């Protein structure tokens, strides 16, 4: 499976704090931002760089910069917004695209109710952010939308993933790498990840 579990001590520590049943909205939201920042560092390891000249204090020197069009970060509404600040802390020049999905009552498949993409999507790397990868339906649908816009360099950043969701993404889009803080046990009968985090969107926005 094309999944990268980020096994860093700080990531594991912060994720455990988020799993606590009495984790407050403020604490959960703060930890979401902190985890997103740490994980974005790992997900950006293979960014291509190029050399260029700058004027240093002692004259011209050669330095490095990220090559090509600026990354677009793609939060899936609404829970994905909770990870956005953490990624932007690390990559403040990133462009933001947004995808909103809802379940079709007849087919039970996710359909888009809102999408806003930046220009030149076919030239940009994209990083999809969503706290939970459960069934994988929303992630697959978002990747479908990005590829329709010509985007080919796509990664997914999630806090917790279920094996079912990882398999769904890998089956539909084997070229997309998933970065996660934990690959949990399974989904329960209601589609929640076990042990998971509960409803991450409700916890981030204080609507639980």
From Swiss-Prot:
InterPro entries: PRibTrfase_dom, PRTase-like, Upp_B, UPRTase/APRTase, Ura_phspho_trans. 5-phospho-alpha-D-ribose 1-diphosphate binds at residues 78, 103, 130-138, 199. Uracil binds at residues 193, 198-200. Pathway: Pyrimidine metabolism; UMP biosynthesis via salvage pathway; UMP from uracil: step 1/1. It is an enzyme of class 2 (transferase). Its EC number is 2.4.2.9. It catalyses: UMP + diphosphate = 5-phospho-alpha-D-ribose 1-diphosphate + uracil. Binds 1 Mg(2+) ion per subunit. The magnesium is bound as Mg-PRPP. One of its GO terms (biological process) is uracil salvage. Allosterically activated by GTP. Its cofactor is Mg(2+). Keywords: Allosteric enzyme, Glycosyltransferase, GTP-binding, Magnesium, Nucleotide-binding, Transferase. Catalyzes the conversion of uracil and 5-phospho-alpha-D-ribose 1-diphosphate (PRPP) to UMP and diphosphate. Belongs to the UPRTase family. This is Uracil phosphoribosyltransferase. It comes from Neisseria gonorrhoeae (strain ATCC 700825 / FA 1090).
């Amino acid at each position: 499976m094309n999944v990268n579990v980020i096994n860093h001590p700080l990531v594991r520590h912060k994720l455990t704090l988020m799993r606590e049943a009495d984790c407050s909205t403020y604490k959960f939201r703060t930890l979401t931002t902190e985890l997103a920042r740490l994980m974005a560092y790992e997900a950006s390891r293979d960014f291509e760089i190029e050399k260029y000249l700058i004027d240093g204090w002692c004259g011209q020197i050669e330095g490095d910069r990220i090559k090509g069009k600026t990354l677009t970060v793609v939060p899936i509404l609404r829970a994905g917004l909770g990870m956005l600040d953490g990624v932007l802390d690390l990559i403040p020049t990133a462009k933001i695209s947004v995808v909103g999905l809802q379940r079709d009552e007849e087919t039970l498949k996710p359909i888009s109710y809102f999408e806003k993409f930046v220009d030149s999507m076919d030239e940009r790397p994209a990083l999809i952010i969503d706290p939970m990868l459960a069934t994988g339906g929303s992630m697959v649908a978002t990747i479908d939308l990005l590829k329709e816009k010509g985007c080919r360099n796509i990664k997914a950043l999630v806090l917790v993933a279920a094996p079912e969701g990882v398999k769904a993404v890998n089956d539909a889009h084997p070229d997309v790498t998933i970065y996660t803080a934990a690959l949990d046990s399974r989904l329960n009968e209601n589609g929640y990840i076990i042990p998971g985090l509960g409803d991450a969107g409700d916890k981030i926005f204080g609507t639980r």
